[in-house]
């Protein structure tokens, strides 16, 4: 099981963005020093009340700080973009990371974003599938000609190419059955959102693997899930530390139309988070977080992308969580996962 950190790129609009990005650099340096496998980020646009750092430029800046770690996108909203540009930028990220880049893409779900880019939401599936095909070909072929529904290419070659051979992994995100089956067929891996419970992930992972097998494809090494992780000396401290920020994050998800979330507004904040986290997040002491991550692994997750900071959270608390994860959880998860394989 690989263990990475999903970087928070969303910050309150009142915060100084330069300070918040300097804090991100500090986090990445600590993440690298503790031996994590990867760093990840996501993409959104038009986020009222928040800064949201642009994904690909952010990873380009962080590549040098992350030397030796993998970089991943979770995820690029591919229907909003020209796939040729994404192929070029992603290839360059592979070059500057030393061949340690994974391209994660997905449909998107916010109507505001599609309206801003003047892309009809009804076209998002066809744009995604066509875009993945174009990127794959541009990474592995010269003189690509493609005449599809959305994109017309005549004799296109990109340089530089990725340095991974045959190419970087392409992962597709979804939380619905049709999208998971699509990810199994057209991509190398599946990006899992943090919403489903562990039991739901286990069932979805089996369906994903069965779809790949029926298509004559090998098992995937890239089932990557965002997991909300709050590691503290004890569960009560974890709940108190994270509740104001995680609950605001999930309230934003609700406002943006993310399905699958319910929050009991009548409960106290810590109890709201306890209910939301049950069988879904990894929250509590190092031992509790270790057990929760291993439960995700047993459910089929091969790469945990752990989100440890949320909008408005103090840097000292983010760093403390990363430090505790790296010192106490990382080695124990790796040891027990290796034992389970033996």
What are these regions (language model features)?
Residues 2-19, 79-150, 190-202, 241, ...:
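Flexible, glycine-rich active-site loops centered on histidine and acidic residues
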């Amino acid at each position: 099981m690989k263990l990475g950190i999903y970087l928070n790129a969303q910050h309150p609009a009142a915060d100084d963005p330069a300070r918040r990005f300097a804090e991100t650099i500090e986090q990445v340096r600590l993440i690298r020093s503790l031996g994590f496998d990867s760093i990840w980020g996501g993409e959104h646009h038009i986020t009222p009340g928040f800064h949201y750092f642009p994904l690909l430029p952010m990873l380009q800046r962080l590549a040098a700080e992350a030397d030796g770690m993998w970089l991943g996108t979770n995820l690029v909203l591919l229907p909003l973009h020209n796939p040729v540009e994404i192929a070029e930028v992603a290839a360059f990220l592979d070059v500057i990371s030393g061949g340690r880049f994974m391209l994660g893409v997905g449909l998107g779900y916010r109507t505001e974003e599609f309206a801003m880019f003047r892309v009809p939401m009804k076209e998002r599936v066809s744009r995604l599938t066509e875009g993945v095909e174009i990127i794959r070909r541009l990474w592995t072929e010269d003189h690509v000609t493609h005449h599809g529904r959305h994109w017309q290419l005549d004799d296109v070659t990109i340089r530089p190419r990725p340095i991974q051979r045959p190419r970087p992994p392409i992962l597709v995100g979804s939380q619905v059955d049709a999208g998971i089956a699509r990810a199994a067929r057209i991509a190398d891996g599946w990006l899992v959102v943090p919403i489903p419970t562990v039991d739901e992930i286990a069932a979805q992972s089996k369906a994903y693997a069965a779809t790949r097998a029926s298509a004559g494809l090998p098992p995937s090494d890239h089932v990557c899930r965002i997991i909300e992780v709050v590691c503290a000396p004890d569960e009560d401290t974890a709940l108190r530390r994270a509740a104001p920020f995680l609950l605001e994050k999930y309230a934003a998800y609700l406002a943006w139309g993310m399905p699958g979330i319910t929050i009991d507004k009548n409960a106290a904040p810590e109890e709201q988070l306890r209910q939301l986290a049950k069988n879904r997040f990894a929250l509590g002491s190092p031992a509790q977080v270790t057990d929760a991550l291993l439960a995700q692994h047993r459910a089929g997750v091969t790469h945990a992308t752990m989100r440890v900071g949320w909008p408005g959270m103090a840097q000292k608390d983010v760093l403390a969580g990363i430090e505790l994860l790296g010192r106490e959880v990382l080695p124990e998860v790796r040891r027990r996962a290796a034992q389970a394989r033996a």
